[in-house]
């Protein structure tokens, strides 16, 4: 269960402070999603992010600065040749664990038009 996993992690790590609640940033026109901001990310390693749109892999990028407050913005324009992603498409963002050759990754956010 999520509860048991949380306590197991608390036992092993002791203190973790993060917030991966996705804040989707709209572009111009507002029917496009240009970025995604996580309020407070883990900073123990330099994580990369994979973006997948409607099942099409747009690649992995890693050069996103962490703000002094710990937030990080993933810029979709960097993945999509300078364009945002239409909000009618499904957007999946995966965090890629460094030093695994991009082989270990976990979905961290998903946009689905409702």
Swiss-Prot record:
Functional summary from the UniProt entry: Lectin with specificity for complex cell-surface carbohydrates. Possesses immunomodulatory activity, stimulates lymphocyte mitogenesis, suppresses systemic anaphylaxis reactions and edema, enhances transcription of IL-2, IFN-gamma and TNF-alpha and hemagglutinates red blood cells.
Keyword Acetylation attributed: yes
Gene3D superfamilies for the chain: Fungal immunomodulatory protein Fve (2.60.40.1790)
Modified residues (N-acetylserine): 1
Subunit comment: Homodimer.
Origin: domain of life: Eukaryota
Species of the source: Flammulina velutipes
Keywords, comma-separated and alphabetical: Acetylation, Lectin
Listed name of the protein: Immunomodulatory protein FIP-Fve
The keyword Methyltransferase appears for this protein: no
Signal sequence interval, chain numbering: none
GO molecular function, one term: carbohydrate binding
Biological process according to GO: regulation of immune system process
Record family assignment: Belongs to the fungal immunomodulatory protein (FIP) family.
InterPro entries: FIP_sf, Fungal_ImmunoLectin_sf, Immunomodulatory_FIP-Fve_fun
């Amino acid at each position: 269960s999520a509860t048991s996993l949380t306590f197991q992690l608390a036992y092993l790590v002791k203190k973790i402070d993060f917030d991966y609640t996705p804040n989707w940033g709209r572009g111009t026109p507002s029917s496009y999603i240009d970025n995604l901001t996580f309020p407070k990310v883990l900073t123990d390693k330099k994580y990369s992010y994979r973006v997948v749109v409607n099942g099409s892999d747009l690649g992995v990028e890693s050069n996103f600065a962490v703000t002094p407050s710990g937030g990080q913005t993933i810029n979709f324009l960097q993945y999509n040749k300078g364009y945002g992603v239409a909000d009618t498409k499904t957007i999946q963002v995966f965090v890629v664990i460094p030093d695994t050759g991009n082989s270990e990754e976990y979905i961290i956010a998903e946009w689905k038009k409702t």
